[in-house]
Amino acid sequence: MQRGAVLLGVVALLVLWPQAGAELYDVNDPDVRAMVIDGQKLMHDCAIANDYIDDPWWTLNLGAFEEKRVYHSMLSELVFCLNAFLQRRQQAP
C-alpha cells in the first residue's frame, strides 16, 4: 500500500513539476501553498517508507518555504528518497 502511495505521489509530482518550477513563487498563493504542503507530506511519507529516523522537512512551517531555494532543496531530497525507495523494492525478493 505504501508503494502505491509513493508511486501516486511521484506521478503527481511529475504532472505538477512545471508549476513548481515557475518563476513566480509566492507562498501566499493557494496553488503554491498546496504544492508546498503536498510536497512536504510526500517527503514525510517517503521518509517513513524508507525507515528514516529523522525528517527535518516535516518540522518546518509554511513560513520556512518563503524562499524558493528551500522548496527546491526539499524536492531534490525527495527525488533521492524516492530513488532509494524504488531501489530497495527492486532488490527485495
Curated annotation (Swiss-Prot):
It is found in: Secreted. Contains 4 disulfide bonds. Keywords: Disulfide bond, Secreted, Signal, Toxin. Residues 23-33 form a propeptide. It comes from the Eukaryota. The keyword Signal applies. GO terms for molecular function: toxin activity. Transmembrane segments: none annotated. The cysteine framework is C-C. This is Conotoxin Mr105.
